[in-house]
């Protein structure tokens, strides 16, 4: 097989049979030169080179000189003679080389080797089946010299060969090496030299010296060859060399030609070689010229050809792909390829396929090998002609016969046997499994079978349907689950469906032998699930830990369910019953047509492309959604014009696709999906305004609707070749009906309108003219049997079901959202669909009525669906919604919304399982969690009155009314409602959040802020667009035809919608979105950033632009509803919340939002509803929203700004809401507490019902929701994937407060807040929050701890009681914005810091915001905040931006905006959420600087000054140390908590400033970051965090691992109310100091041991406590920073952030994760060892440590949740590897998602107590145990160790030592668990050390005042404290681990 590679290339493109030869011919001048050289070197023919005709099996490369020749040939480029170029009928024959040469201008030499194309030697070698060209005449032209002159290298001999065939002649340029290649090909494949009498050409080196001799020799050679050349020559490479095809046509591509055939063919294969053309490629195939549109440049990465149009040879893979994927039979059936985009015919492929050698022949020659393993299932079945894979059939038959043995499928076979079998199957042989070897190793057969499925490019259950499956199993009842699963299964591509049925029936039979095999269905499901059901997210690097486990759990639940219901699920009966019941025959299975095969084949090839692209782009949000959708062949379909469309198969004509705005490949994706996916959906939506409700609700009700973002279409296209293509329209509709369909619509840009389609066909009208029936059917399919009467069932199915469903405790619904991460777009699209029409037309033109209207109605509908069970009669239309899904659809669809404007409030009590795009989820999660819960309640109460306001809030809060009513309903999670809510407004840009909540006119400043938020929200917010404007809502509602009532109705509806939104979030978060929330988040961020950059007021501005007047009335009702706030604030609040959700959605939506949302939603809902809502019906929820996502907060801020006077009020409200700073925050605080305490992950869900109970207008619940969301997000999202994309999501999730802060600061509280008047905003933010804190001291831990921060000092004392909370809000001012978020932020502390812009916050809240931003977690969530940053950028807050940059983290320290630092601290707590993203932590750290900006900006150092009165430095806990040098570092340790390194910024964030560390001024998160408000509460009791009033500690002051900071623990005078942390009892402080000293000593002693020093802690801090990273400055005050252990800890701890000091949480860690410990520095290394020991001690004293950690976590409200999880994870799981684990940990309760949870509670309490006493009053209050632990931590830190202790604790160095897996910076929970042992180590010297309440210790002791609350700050500079990093960061930046 000479030139096997060449041939292979041609084989790949049989039609281009001669392609390879071209390359030879393409020899460029250089080749000629080479030839010359060769000839000169020797004229002797090498005898050994002459080979008699050999069997074809001999590959040319096998010959010694073959490679040389072939490569020479490959290098050569033919020179096409312009006049002579003829287009043979079979252009494909042309070799790549020749093509390249042709392309090359004249003699321009193109070296193939030069380009990306493979060398000829690497190309496929093939032979033509039939050759008929008569004879060929080859002669050397007479003007050979010219050739060499033409720029060919003089060394190489190049000859112009004239080839004549069939009366035509042309000239090819060939080098001497090319001649040798030709010779070899001819004699290896065609002639025996004895016959040809052609002697082998000598090596070039032997002849190159004598060019003339060479010429003569070649002339003789060609002469002889011409005599014998004839039809015998069927060798592709040889003919290609001559540039002729098997028919004698000249394979010629004009120089102008863009691509040659091979390249064309390649375009269809994985390698996709194409020449680049401006817009299209002209292929001349045979006599047919096909024009293929070139994909856009961004999509042409796979077009290897450079601008020179080099052509490459195709590797054998290409050949295989082409043959495998497009068998000849398929070729004939392939519909005329039509480029969807340009509609040009692409017949090239068909011709190509026809002309290529038969597959059989290629196989016979060994040229073609079909892949079996790793080949797309549809492709494989197509190629093999089997119903199900032969591997499966053979293995199952064998196993059923011989494999009924114990552990079948569980035990693994012998690898060698498995490989043997695999090879046999791959060789297309059916191995005899009955051989003894296999009989003896039966398990190898089972393993092989699993391996086959594991290696499928697209899993059996397909990536596209993953979310749907996970959503379906989260249904409330078995019946519903059955229907949903059935519905999703029906969406599988036929090959997958058949295979699944076969496999499931087999496994089901096998399960009947469980008594023998011990493999019952559960076990079988466990072993099979990962092979059958995978999500891209799970497979992403970011996905690990808890999230992964949760996903696995989901997978096994799905598989087990299918196994248990095989007969039902795969029976035609059920399908018909469901179809009849649902009234949508569309449920029918797509016809299992191989029909799709034609498209499949091409698609397959493309699919490979798409897959590759998807892998490349999938991280990219923009692209990924499409690619993801089109993961399968369909994806390529839309993407690459070359893809052949299947118009005939697809009911939807291409025109439909054209209709889709996206067009191009997006449209193609739609193609893949049922027609409803894109244009069809839109059309349907438009067409069926009335129908949509039912359909939509159905769709949403259907698990797949909710779960998958992709529309069924998309899925179809992906999975199968559009099973729907062949199917009747009904089928397609049915599929589209599924949420996947809806998602699909949203998925596509044009599908944005489709949101309706997805939700209900209400949107269809707007969406163009999709097939109405399809849309209708499609929805019902999802709902399938649900009827309006089923409303009650529906909501629980989704919301409750998910929550209740244990497997879905992941929160299937959130998972849906998550899964919709990419589908976020879906949500966005839905919103955009609704609003895309609007968003595109109106979103950007907020004023656009159209944009508003559809969404508004939609919103109403959404509400209806969400509240369907409880919907009031008022929702006249909604009442119609039969099933929850239907309701949901209604809610989502604008038309429906209109109808449902008055739809009775769907009570959240019946959870709606709506598949919200991740973004929407995020939006919801960020704000709905809080807002929805609150809103729900409010909505119920103010259904009419607050309708409007509710709507307004909805935008901000998802719906203010909804807050009210939703609060109650949202509690149940009204899971999908939030998403729907977005649609209601119709304004939901991409975020899908409806900002309609902002009814009030937005002032320019507000707009600016909003714009900033918009940036943050990105398009998402734009979608919300501040439909918030009442006018817009009004318009939307009015459009509904209820002008006056409409607003109310809309509001009411919206309220439910919001509720739904919240629910959706809460439900969805549990499972991380397989859709790659990160990607969605990134997309959202990118979009928001772009919008922010491009449009100062992109989305939000636009929304703001919307006339707000109409809204005002609604707002007023809201205001009325929340009497506490003036009407304006309420309005503002509602508006802001509306905006906020989009932001969140955008940011968090992808990954964390779902997760976060879930947790948050639940929690928020808990508190939000009544308590918070009343005063702040919408605002409180907004608070939650902030918690949910930075965007949320931003939204809030923007809305308030927009609402100038109201803004302030709203800001105050929003702060309460967003930060639980709002007026109603207090009540919510209690709820928050509840929520916090409740299992963070999704325990909120349970709370939700309670939440609804809170009819009061206290939206504080949002804070709770945030907690819960954070917890969930942490568990589900963070663990799922903390990718660059997720990172944003995480940021959102963890740092929602940050985002909120960002939002608020960004807002500037724009004119108002920025004006420096925080009175309403800032004060309300802080004071209100404080007040709220006071009010809801117990209830809303998150709020409480936030609120204390909110009020600089005024409520400090009062809050001290609520120290747990207050410490958390140590960033009172800055944090207040963020406070509510903080609990939510717990998971994503990094986010807030990142996003906070000092400028924005500066006025009054910036510090808080910045503080949050400072958080390392924030940096971890840098992306999210980056968006904010972008928005803030509009605010032109340099600080903000810096906080964005991961590397800048350090600079935060030097930034003078200390106030923001405080905020950062708040964020830090949320940062703890970050631990899962710890891997991103480095970035996070880098991003700390952004925190820095915010941290430093606004807050004066006054707080810091308060801190300065540290106790004497004699104590390590010289908390009040202001600037001082320690170990050469200046530590400004003012500190109640800060001790040396800690620094309270005016924003009342703690900043651990490590003078030595790089400006690692990181705000230690107060407790907010902690997912658990309860943590915060418990930890904060003692004011763990500085109070807001405390001046921010200068970074220098903050001492992460500063020598000083460690040595001098920050000690705020206990009397210092602001530094809540300081509220330690003196006794505690003393104890703490003593312990700290002792600890430090021990730690130092141990430093040499396991590298578990505080610095060790630092490392863990990095990992576990991104948010708590500040704790990372593990060096205790006393520790001069020599304790390298600290840094080591950080390193060991998973290097979350290098030596990240508490204060440095954001800024400091940007540097090296470990060694970077600014304060850790070198000392870290030695400390590390101590730290390790310390950690061990820590683990040993795990109870102390854990308790402390828990405590700290709570106290680190923001980071708290993240840290505890990390800690536990550290213990139970490697905390570094598992961001999710961390998340889980972050969830106060689900810290470790293990026993540690319990520990966490307990520890939380203990820690809390300690922290209350030390860091937070509450902490100390809680119990001595924890106090003792805290004291220990302090001890570790020596007197100043409390902070340092925190840091270590956060890092859990001890844990690290014990369990490297416990690297989470926040080892709080994990570490505590693990730390049980480690802690002892660390605590060895601490053992007896009873941490004095850190708070108290702050003054005398170290930052314990601060650290104690962290509970994790335990790490002492000695390296003993392991908790330090995680907890400190979490608890309060101020705590900045001043570990010694």
Curated annotation (Swiss-Prot):
Tagged with keyword Cell membrane: yes
GO BP terms, alphabetized: small GTPase-mediated signal transduction
Location of the protein in the cell: Cytoplasm; Membrane; Cell membrane
Biased composition (Polar residues): 1047-1061, 1725-1734
Gene3D superfamilies to which the protein is assigned, alphabetical: Phox-like domain (3.30.1520.10), Rho GTPase activation protein (1.10.555.10), SH3 Domains (2.30.30.40)
Annotated region (Disordered), positions in chain: 646-746, 1035-1163, 1219-1264, 1430-1454, 1675-1786
Keywords, comma-separated and alphabetical: Cell membrane, Cytoplasm, GTPase activation, Membrane, SH3 domain
Biased composition (Basic and acidic residues): 1691-1707, 1736-1755
All residue ranges annotated as the PX domain in the record: 154-248
Keyword Metal-binding: no
Residues carrying the site annotation Arginine finger: 410
Example GO molecular function: GTPase activator activity
GO cellular component, one term: postsynaptic density
Domain called Rho-GAP: residue spans: 375-570
Domain (SH3) ranges: 262-324
PROSITE patterns to which the protein is assigned, alphabetical: RHOGAP, SH3
Family: Belongs to the PX domain-containing GAP family.
UniProt note: domains: The N-terminal PX domain interacts specifically with phosphatidylinositides.
Protein known as: Rho GTPase-activating protein 32
Organism field: Xenopus laevis (African clawed frog)
Source lineage: Eukaryota, Metazoa, Chordata, Craniata, Vertebrata
């Amino acid at each position: 097989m000479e030139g096997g590679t060449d041939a292979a290339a041609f084989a790949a493109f049989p039609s281009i049979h001669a392609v390879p030869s071209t390359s030879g011919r393409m020899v460029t001048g250089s080749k000629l030169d080479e030839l010359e050289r060769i000839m000169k070197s020797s004229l002797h023919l090498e005898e050994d080179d002459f080979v008699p005709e050999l069997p074809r099996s001999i590959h040319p490369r096998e010959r010694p000189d073959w490679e040389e020749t072939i490569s020479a040939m490959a290098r050569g480029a033919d020179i096409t003679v312009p006049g002579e170029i003829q287009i043979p009928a079979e252009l494909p024959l042309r070799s790549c080389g020749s093509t390249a040469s042709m392309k090359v201008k004249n003699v321009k030499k193109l070296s193939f080797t030069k380009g990306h194309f493979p060398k000829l030697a690497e190309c496929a070698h093939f032979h033509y089946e039939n050759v008929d060209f008569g004879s060929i005449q080859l002669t050397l032209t007479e003007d050979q010299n010219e050739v060499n002159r033409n720029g060919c290298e003089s060394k190489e001999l190049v000859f112009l060969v004239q080839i004549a065939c069939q009366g035509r002649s042309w000239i090819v340029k060939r080098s001497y090496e090319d001649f040798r290649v030709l010779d070899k090909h001819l004699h290896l494949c065609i002639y025996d030299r004895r016959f040809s009498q052609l002697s082998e050409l000598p090596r070039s080196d032997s002849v190159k010296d004598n060019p003339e001799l060479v010429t003569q020799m070649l002339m003789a050679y060609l002469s002889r060859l011409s005599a014998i050349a004839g039809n015998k020559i069927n060798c592709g490479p040889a003919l290609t060399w001559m540039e002729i095809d098997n028919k004698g046509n000249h394979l010629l591509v004009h120089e102008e030609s863009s691509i040659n055939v091979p390249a064309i063919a390649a375009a269809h294969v994985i390698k996709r070689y194409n020449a680049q053309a401006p817009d299209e490629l002209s292929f001349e195939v045979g006599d047919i010229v096909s024009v293929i549109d070139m994909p856009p440049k961004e999509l042409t990465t796979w077009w290897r050809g450079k601008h020179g149009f080099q052509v490459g040879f195709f590797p054998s893979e290409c050949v295989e792909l082409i043959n495998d994927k497009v068998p000849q039979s398929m070729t004939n059936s392939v519909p005329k390829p039509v480029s969807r985009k340009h509609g040009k015919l692409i017949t090239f492929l068909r011709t190509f396929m026809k002309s290529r050698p038969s597959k059989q022949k290629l196989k016979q020659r060994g040229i073609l090998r079909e892949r079996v393993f790793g080949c797309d299932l549809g492709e494989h079945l197509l190629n093999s002609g089997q119903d199900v894979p032969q591997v499966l059939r053979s293995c199952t038959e064998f196993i059923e016969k011989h494999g009924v043995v114990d552990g079948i499928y569980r035990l693994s076979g012998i690898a060698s046997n498995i490989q043997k079998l695999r090879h046999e199957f791959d060789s297309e042989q059916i191995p005899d499994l009955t051989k003894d070897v296999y009989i003896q190793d039966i398990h190898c057969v089972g393993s092989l079978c699993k391996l086959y499925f594991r290696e499928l490019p697209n899993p059996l259950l397909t990536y596209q349907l993953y979310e749907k499956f996970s959503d379906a199993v989260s249904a409330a009842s078995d019946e519903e689950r059955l229907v949903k699963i059935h519905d999703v299964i029906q969406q599988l591509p036929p090959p997958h469906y058949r295979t699944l049925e076969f496999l499931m029936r087999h496994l089901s039979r096998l399960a009947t032998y469980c008594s023998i095999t011990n493999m019952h269905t559960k076990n079988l499901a466990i072993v099979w699930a990962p092979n059958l059901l995978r999500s891209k997210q799970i497979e992403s690097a970011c996905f690990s830990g808890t999230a992964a486990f949760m996903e696995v759990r989901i997978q096994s639940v799905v598989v087990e369910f299918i196994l248990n219901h095989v007969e039902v699920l795969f029976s035609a009966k059920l399908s018909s019953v469901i179809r009849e019941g649902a009234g949508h025959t569309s449920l029918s299975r797509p016809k299992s047509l191989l029909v799709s095969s034609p498209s499949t084949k091409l698609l397959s090839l493309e699919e490979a492309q798409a897959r590759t692209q998807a892998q490349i782009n999938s991280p990219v949000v923009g692209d990924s959604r499409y690619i993801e959708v089109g993961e399968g062949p369909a994806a390529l379909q839309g993407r690459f014009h070359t893809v052949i469309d299947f118009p005939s198969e697809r009911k939807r004509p291409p025109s439909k696709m054209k209709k889709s705005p996206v067009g191009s490949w997006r449209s193609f994706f739609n193609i893949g999906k049922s027609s409803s996916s894109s244009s069809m959906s839109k059309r349907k939506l438009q067409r069926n305004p009335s129908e949509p409700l039912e359909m939509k609700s159905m769709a949403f009700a259907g698990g797949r609707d909710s779960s998958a973002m992709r529309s069924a279409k998309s899925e179809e296209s992906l999975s199968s070749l559009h099973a729907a293509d062949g199917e009747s329209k009904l089928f397609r509709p049915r599929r589209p009906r599924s949420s996947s369909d809806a998602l699909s619509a949203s998925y596509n840009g044009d599908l944005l309108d489709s949101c309706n389609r997805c939700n209900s066909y209400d949107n269809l009208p707007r969406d163009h003219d999709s097939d109405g029936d399809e849309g209708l059917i499609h929805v019902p399919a999802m709902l399938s049997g649900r009827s309006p009467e089923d409303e009650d069932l529906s909501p629980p199915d989704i919301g409750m079901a998910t929550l209740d469903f244990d497997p879905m405790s992941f929160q299937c619904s959130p998972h849906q959202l998550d899964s919709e991460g990419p589908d976020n777009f879906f949500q966005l699209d839905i919103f955009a669909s609704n609003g895309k029409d609007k968003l595109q037309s109106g979103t950007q033109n907020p004023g656009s009525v159209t944009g508003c209207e559809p969404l508004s109605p939609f919103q109403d509908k959404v509400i209806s669906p969400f509240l369907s069970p409880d919907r009031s009669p008022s929702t006249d239309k909604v009442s119609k919604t039969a099933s929850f899904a239907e309701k949901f659809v209604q809610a989502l669809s604008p038309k429906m919304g209109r109808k449902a404007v008055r739809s009775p409030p769907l009570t959240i009590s019946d959870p709606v399982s709506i598949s919200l795009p991740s973004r929407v989820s995020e939006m919801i999660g960020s704000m709905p969690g809080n807002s929805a819960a609150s809103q729900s309640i409010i909505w119920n109460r103010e259904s009419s009155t607050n309708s409007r306001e509710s709507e307004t809030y909805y935008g901000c809060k998802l719906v203010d009314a909804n807050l009210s009513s939703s609060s109650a309903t949202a509690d149940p999670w009204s899971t999908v409602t939030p998403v729907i809510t977005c649609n209601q407004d119709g304004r939901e840009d991409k975020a899908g959040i409806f900002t309609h909540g902002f009814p009030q006119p937005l002032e320019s400043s507000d707009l600016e802020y909003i714009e900033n938020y918009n940036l943050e929200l990105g398009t998402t917010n734009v979608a919300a667009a501040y439909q918030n404007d009442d006018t817009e809502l009004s318009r939307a509602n009015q459009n509904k035809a209820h002008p006056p009532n409409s607003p109310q109705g809309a509001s009411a509806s919206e309220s439910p919608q919001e509720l739904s939104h919240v629910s959706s979030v809460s439900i969805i978060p549990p499972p991380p979105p397989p859709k790659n929330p990160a990607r969605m988040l990134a997309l959202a961020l990118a979009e928001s950033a772009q919008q922010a950059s491009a449009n100062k007021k992109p989305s939000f501005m636009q929304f703001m632009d919307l006339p707000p007047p109409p809204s005002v009335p609604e707002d007023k009702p809201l205001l009325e509803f929340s009497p506490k706030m003036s009407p304006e604030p309420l309005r503002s609040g509602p508006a802001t919340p509306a905006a906020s959700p989009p932001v969140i959605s955008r940011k968090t939506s992808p990954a964390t939002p779902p997760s976060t949302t879930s947790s948050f939603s639940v929690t928020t809902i808990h508190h939000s509803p009544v308590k918070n809502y009343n005063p702040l019906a919408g605002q409180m929820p907004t608070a939650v929203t902030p918690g949910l996502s930075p965007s949320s907060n931003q939204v809030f801020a923007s809305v308030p700004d927009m609402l100038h006077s109201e803004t302030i009020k709203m800001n105050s409200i929003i702060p309460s809401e967003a930060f639980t700073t709002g007026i109603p925050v207090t009540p919510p605080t209690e709820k928050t507490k509840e929520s916090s305490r409740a299992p963070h992950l999704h325990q909120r869900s349970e709370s939700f019902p309670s939440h609804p109970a809170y009819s009061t207008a206290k939206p504080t619940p949002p804070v709770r929701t945030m907690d819960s969301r954070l917890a969930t997000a942490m568990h589900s999202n963070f663990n799922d994937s903390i990718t660059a994309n997720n990172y944003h999501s995480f940021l959102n999730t963890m740092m929602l407060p940050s985002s909120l802060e960002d939002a608020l600061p960004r807002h500037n509280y724009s004119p108002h807040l920025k004006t420096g008047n925080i009175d309403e905003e800032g004060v309300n933010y802080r004071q209100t929050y404080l007040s709220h804190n006071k009010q809801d001291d117990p209830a809303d831990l998150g709020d409480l701890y936030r609120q204390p921060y909110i009020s600089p000092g005024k409520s400090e004392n009062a809050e001290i009681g609520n120290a747990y909370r207050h410490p958390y809000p140590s960033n009172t001012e800055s944090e207040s914005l963020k406070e509510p978020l903080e609990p939510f932020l717990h998971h994503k502390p990094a986010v807030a810091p990142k996003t906070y812009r000092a400028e924005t916050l500066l006025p009054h809240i910036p510090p808080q915001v910045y503080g949050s931003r400072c958080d390392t977690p924030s940096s971890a969530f840098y992306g999210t905040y980056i968006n904010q940053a972008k928005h803030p950028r509009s605010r032109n807050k340099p600080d903000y931006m810096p906080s964005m940059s991961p590397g800048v983290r350090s600079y935060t320290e030097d930034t003078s905006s200390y106030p923001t630092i405080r905020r950062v601290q708040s964020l830090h707590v949320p940062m703890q959420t970050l631990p899962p993203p710890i891997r991103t932590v480095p970035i996070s750290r880098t991003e700390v600087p952004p925190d820095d900006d915010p941290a430093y900006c606004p807050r004066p150092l006054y707080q810091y000054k308060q801190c300065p009165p540290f106790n004497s430095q004699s104590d390590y806990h010289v908390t009040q140390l202001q600037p001082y040098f320690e170990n050469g570092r200046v530590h400004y340790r003012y500190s109640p908590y800060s001790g040396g390194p800690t620094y309270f910024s005016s924003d009342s964030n703690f900043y651990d400033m490590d003078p030595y560390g790089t400006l690692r001024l990181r705000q230690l998160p107060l407790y907010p970051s902690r997912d658990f408000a309860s943590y915060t509460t418990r930890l904060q009791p003692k004011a763990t965090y500085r109070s807001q009033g405390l001046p921010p500690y200068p970074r220098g002051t903050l001492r992460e691992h500063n020598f000083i900071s460690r040595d001098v623990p920050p000690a705020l005078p206990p009397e210092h109310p602001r530094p809540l942390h300081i509220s330690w009892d003196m006794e505690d402080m003393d104890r703490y100091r003593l312990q700290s000293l002792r600890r430090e000593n021990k730690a130092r002693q141990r430093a040499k041991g396991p590298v578990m020093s505080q610095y060790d802690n630092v490392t863990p801090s990095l990992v576990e406590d991104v948010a708590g990273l500040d704790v990372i400055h593990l060096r205790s005050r006393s520790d001069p920073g020599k304790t390298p252990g600290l840094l080591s800890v950080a390193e060991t701890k998973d290097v979350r952030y290098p030596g990240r000091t508490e204060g440095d949480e954001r800024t400091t860690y940007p540097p090296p994760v470990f060694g970077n410990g600014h304060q850790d520095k070198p000392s870290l290394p030695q400390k590390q060892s101590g730290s390790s020991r310390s950690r061990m001690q820590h683990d040993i004293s795990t109870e102390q440590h854990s308790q402390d950690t828990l405590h700290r976590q709570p106290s680190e409200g923001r980071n708290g949740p993240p840290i505890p999880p990390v800690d536990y994870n550290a213990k139970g799981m490697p905390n570094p590897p598992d961001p999710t684990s961390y998340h889980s940990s972050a969830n106060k309760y689900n810290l470790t998602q293990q026993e540690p949870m319990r520990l966490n509670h307990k520890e939380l309490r203990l820690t809390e107590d300690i922290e209350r006493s030390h860091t937070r009053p509450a902490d100390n209050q809680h119990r001595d145990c924890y106090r003792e632990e805290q004291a220990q931590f302090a001890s570790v830190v020596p007197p100043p160790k409390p902070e340092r202790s925190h840091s270590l604790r956060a890092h859990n160095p001890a844990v690290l030592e014990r369990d490297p897996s416990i690297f989470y910076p926040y080892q709080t929970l994990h570490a505590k668990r693990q730390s049980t042992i480690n802690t002892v180590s660390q605590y060895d010297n601490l053992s007896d050390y009873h941490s004095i309440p850190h708070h108290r210790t702050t003054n005398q002791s170290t930052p314990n005042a601060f650290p104690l609350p962290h509970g994790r700050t335990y790490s002492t500079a000695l390296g003993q404290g392991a908790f330090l990093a995680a907890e400190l960061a979490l608890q309060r930046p101020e705590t900045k681990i001043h570990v010694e």
